[in-house]
Amino acid sequence: MTNIRKTHPLIKIINHSFIDLPAPSNISSWWNFGSLLGLCLMIQILTGLFLAMHYTSDTTTAFSSVTHICRDVNYGWLIRYMHANGASMFFICLFLHVGRGMYYGSYTFMETWNIGVILLFTVMATAFMGYVLPWGQMSFWGATVITNLLSAIPYIGTTLVEWIWGGFSVDKATLTRFFAFHFILPFIITALVIVHLLFLHETGSNNPTGLNSDADKIPFHPYYTIKDLLGVLILMLSLMILVLFFPDLLSDPDNYMPANPLNTPPHIKPEWYFLFAYAILRSIPNKLGGVLALIMSILILAFLPFLHTSKQRSMIFRPITQMLYWVLVANLLVLTWIGGQPVEHPFIIIGQLASISYFSIILILMPVSGIIEDKLLKWSL
């Protein structure tokens, strides 16, 4: 009698994806983030579902319904803060996952990488719309500022913004449609994740050396299921410490004030995970230019396969590119800091310099360093 695991039409798919999947024997903990992102997505969908049971998407009651969830619903405070901080954990894992892909040259798997870039855009859109739902001051003004950016599109801009708003300002119609989109998008993300995995399993995983690992594969279970379990433990511990001890550490105090269209907060800023892109947007004085720079700050990832000039896939044996990579990481941290600062001297010039260096490193310096390293390698042989 054959094993049901290998014959049943449905179980067979799970078996080939998570149990008998041939995986390289040398993948490090940087490869844990895929499974952690899956866990984050599950947490967000489950907590979001329970929040949606008590939330009302009406401008007059939205803020009160969130207060009601925290005060009156059984463990409502826990569900709400797990959802809010779960988003932060999601983005931490996302950035580390993308960073790993850049460092080890995973972007050479074109289909997997491009689906990943689409996923990143979709998750960012979902998080933005979710931030609007509590209908606090920063929710309202964040929605107003970000949606208003679309008015920079020539000819159709203003009409497009009013179409998205469902009126002449951010109001009830906007909140209702944002709630609808925020509810449906995680399921679209789940579908995209399946496609992402489908393409990944066509080629198999990359590994730290960037070399072909077909000659040295081990089954995913038990080796990497146990390894992933450690990551799950660390992630859940970090999330629960954040939720139970510092629930408001990453949120804006302004969002505890109900939305008031007549009172603008002194500093309008998005959640911390959008600050780097927000800093790039603000560093360009022209509105359309800023919007294009904002989009390009993420879309640039899709060009990485074409900007790869080295004969080696991974950065592990490429010291010059390694140095540039870590300068890029530091640069992103500077941009994140600048995004949270007011628009005044010296923050404006720091933001502009950081934005220029962000694009320069990716578009010019890294491809040039790849060519230089290849030449040095050729001369040393």
UniProtKB/Swiss-Prot annotation:
Q: Which InterPro entries match?
A: Cyt_b/b6_C (IPR005798), Cyt_b/b6_C_sf (IPR036150), Cyt_b/b6_N (IPR005797), Cytb/b6-like_sf (IPR027387), Cytochrome_b (IPR030689), Cytochrome_b_C_euk/bac (IPR048260), Cytochrome_b_N_euk/bac (IPR048259), Di-haem_cyt_TM (IPR016174)
Keywords attached to this entry:
Electron transport, Heme, Iron, Membrane, Metal-binding, Mitochondrion, Mitochondrion inner membrane, Respiratory chain, Transmembrane, Transmembrane helix, Transport, Ubiquinone
The UniProt record gives the binding positions of a ubiquinone as 201
* Amino acids binding heme b b566: 97, 196
Q: How does this polypeptide assemble, per the annotation?
A: The cytochrome bc1 complex contains 11 subunits: 3 respiratory subunits (MT-CYB, CYC1 and UQCRFS1), 2 core proteins (UQCRC1 and UQCRC2) and 6 low-molecular weight proteins (UQCRH/QCR6, UQCRB/QCR7, UQCRQ/QCR8, UQCR10/QCR9, UQCR11/QCR10 and a cleavage product of UQCRFS1). This cytochrome bc1 complex then forms a dimer.
Q: What else is known?
A: Heme 1 (or BL or b562) is low-potential and absorbs at about 562 nm, and heme 2 (or BH or b566) is high-potential and absorbs at about 566 nm.
Q: What is this protein called?
A: Cytochrome b
* Species assigned in the record: Chrotomys silaceus (Silver earth rat)
